[in-house]
Amino acid sequence: MMQLTPDLLISAYAQGIFPMADEFGAINFYDPNPRAIFPLDSFYVPRRLARTVRSGRFTIRVDSAFRAVMLACAEPGPGRASTWISDSIVAAYEELHEQGFAHSVEAWREGVLVGGLYGVALRGLFAGESMFSRERDASKVALVHLVERLRAGGYVLLDTQFLGSDHFRQFGVVEIPRSEYKRRLAAALRVDASFS
């Protein structure tokens, strides 16, 4: 079985590919066409969600519970008995996190982790990997905070890989051809962005 290492993962993201485990735990790499991205300059926050963000209902933390976020994202959900986030993927991304390339944005309420997301930051690219929510809007609020952080840090590309669920559409997610994604990725890798 393929051994995921931080160097292998960084090389993969720099080429526009990413890993997922199949139902047997085997790691496969993907390079979808088309590719889904959130345009950072036109990311749209619906009015109701903007009120929730402003309300302070959730406390947002960054990188305080990276492993817990990954494990929550890996939990089975409605219509999904298993997930592509295997034990080996968790271990590899924890190493990336320790090296400063993988980050989590977490929504907490009354001291309990109720939502969040994680992904990989490489130069001007942030590749969103997965998100979870145990309370309404928790992961969406984390996403809004992620976008604010990426804009402030000089990022130029927020990759969401696949179109995913319909709720992404409300934020302005778009699909672009693989060739256009690779062009934008090359430009993003020339950008000196900062997540902190």
Predicted features and spans:
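N-acyltransferase acceptor-side catalytic subdomain
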Residues: M1-S196
